[in-house]
């Protein structure tokens, strides 16, 4: 989450992985093969800005609601990679301008079968889960079943882990 921001509307951006809680996301079952993607640091979930459904709508964090803009499907893409498809928009998480530099904004876009839309989900190592994590926001509720993951974006052999830190 950009600048470790705990407020609603904070941007979700790409950043080199540093093993920090603000770079870790939980996939919380929402039924029907859908998930809410909750940030470990803020307790807020990935959401579509202003419930937008058009190409280029930014992905940000927001307190959990019942809205479909916060529900995602994990779509197998082969080679150990997945796409994250939003239920409301029927579009996948993508990176603005197909960039992989630190600070690149996450957005949704129609599935164009591009590398910039592929993600690798890695379990968070137990040693990181055991680190003291800041208390979640009051809006966060403890889900019945979650999977903690870190996401990784690879391009041209250089790895940049998905994060939310922006400077």
Predicted features along the sequence, with ranges:
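Lectin-like carbohydrate-binding module/patch detector with strong preference for beta-trefoil
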Residues: 1-167
């Amino acid at each position: 989450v950009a600048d470790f921001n705990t407020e609603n509307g904070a941007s979700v951006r790409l950043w080199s992985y540093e093993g920090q809680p603000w770079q870790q996301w939980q996939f919380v079952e929402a039924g029907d093969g859908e998930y809410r993607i909750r940030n470990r640091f803020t307790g807020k979930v990935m959401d579509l800005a202003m419930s937008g459904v058009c190409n280029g709508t930014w992905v940000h964090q927001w307190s959990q609601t019942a809205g479909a803009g916060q529900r995602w499907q994990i779509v197998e893409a082969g080679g150990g990679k997945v796409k994250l498809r939003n239920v409301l928009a029927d579009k996948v998480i993508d990176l603005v301008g197909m960039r992989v530099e630190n600070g690149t904004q996450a957005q949704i876009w129609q599935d164009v079968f591009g590398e910039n839309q592929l993600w690798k989900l890695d379990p968070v190592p137990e040693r990181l889960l055991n680190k003291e994590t800041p208390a979640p926001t009051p809006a966060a509720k403890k889900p019945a079943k979650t999977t903690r993951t870190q996401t990784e974006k690879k391009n041209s052999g250089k790895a940049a882990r998905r994060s939310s830190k922006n400077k």
